[in-house]
């Protein structure tokens, strides 16, 4: 059976899908749906703004926002101005008020926190570009700690940029093959999300050529990697903890069989927690085992698979790694030093929760989530928490990323930009406001939300927006 649509379907893939969807009408719905444009969707970042306040803020734009059933913060979006202004160039996106995220990919984190679970230490084993890490951080309210790992070096920078834009402060980043965590950090996490690398069969609506390199042999190779990763994730999970395994592919080899492989290996230590009541209508995509197997035609979305597992008992540990990590190059501040920094930061409108602790490396001051401290020296971190400031004989140079996460828009030194000035800010240009500036160090705000920190130099605001984030092209002033 051949298809001459814009989407490339390998014959063996079509045969596989016919076996998965033996009803001819349903199979045809799958084929038809897979060739339709994917609906755009976003998730409101509640670290920055409530859903109600966001809806009020964007109401003048006349965006058509349809709630996503499995994510209270998620909406499908239709815009009349989509051709004139990219969604990623809107002021609300640049300020981290929302994340452009495919609807199905919101499912794994919703499953992770289903039933009121509130883990204190979470690992996102394959984290880039950051949609799920930022979603986890929002669920946790920036409390506790997240270890966000990404194996692909080219994606680590994107992960950090998204964490920063969204004001995430409770995350430590690593850059490893996920197979290291079971041996290196056994029983260290209350929850683990493994959104596993996969063959991507569910993303053809976004990429018509996604299946060009598809083959059953490559599926087998990928599944072997997934099996090793889920085993590592399970060992890193403490007894009583939750493991969510997900992919954006459709075949059972990378989905049900990988999860069932873990169940067969540890039959007395793993319990499946069914997802049929995760949201209204979830039973339409629930398998006999209790997993979610979302085909594109069921909810008019990408294809996705999600399983939620509970670790009910310890298992024999994996062999310990032979390498030594070495002592991290940071030292905690003493109480007097902490009080000095806290007071200085508060004077410019920067405040943080007591779960964040002050550490120093040379002239750099950092805020580490305290939940990550027991892991220091056990794996090498590429970045931990927030860089707060650099120290100088005359004071501190406060950092942009810390301001975005910690600044108080109601502080005395907050300065609200108009839309033209905000555009100039994101373009990396100094600003020349025609009104008085309240202080020498300013929390820069737009729409009553902090978007950076800057110094007053005479009558101008010296732009401190990071060079790597500076935007060109059309921005939000139409």
UniProtKB/Swiss-Prot annotation:
S-adenosyl-L-methionine binds at residues 126-132, 150, 177, 195. GO terms for molecular function: RNA binding; rRNA (cytosine-C5-)-methyltransferase activity. Keywords: Cytoplasm, Methyltransferase, RNA-binding, rRNA processing, S-adenosyl-L-methionine, Transferase. It is found in: Cytoplasm. The active site is at residue 248. Its EC number is 2.1.1.178. Its main location: cytoplasm. It is an enzyme of class 2 (transferase). It catalyses: cytidine(1407) in 16S rRNA + S-adenosyl-L-methionine = 5-methylcytidine(1407) in 16S rRNA + S-adenosyl-L-homocysteine + H(+). One of its GO terms (cellular component) is cytoplasm. GO terms for biological process: rRNA base methylation. Pfam families: Methyltr_RsmB-F, Methyltr_RsmF_N, Methyltranf_PUA, YebU_pre-PUA_dom. PROSITE patterns: NOL1_NOP2_SUN, SAM_MT_RSMB_NOP. Specifically methylates the cytosine at position 1407 (m5C1407) of 16S rRNA. NCBIfam families: nop2p, PRK11933.1. Belongs to the class I-like SAM-binding methyltransferase superfamily. RsmB/NOP family. This is Ribosomal RNA small subunit methyltransferase F. It comes from Erwinia tasmaniensis (strain DSM 17950 / CFBP 7177 / CIP 109463 / NCPPB 4357 / Et1/99). The gene is rsmF.
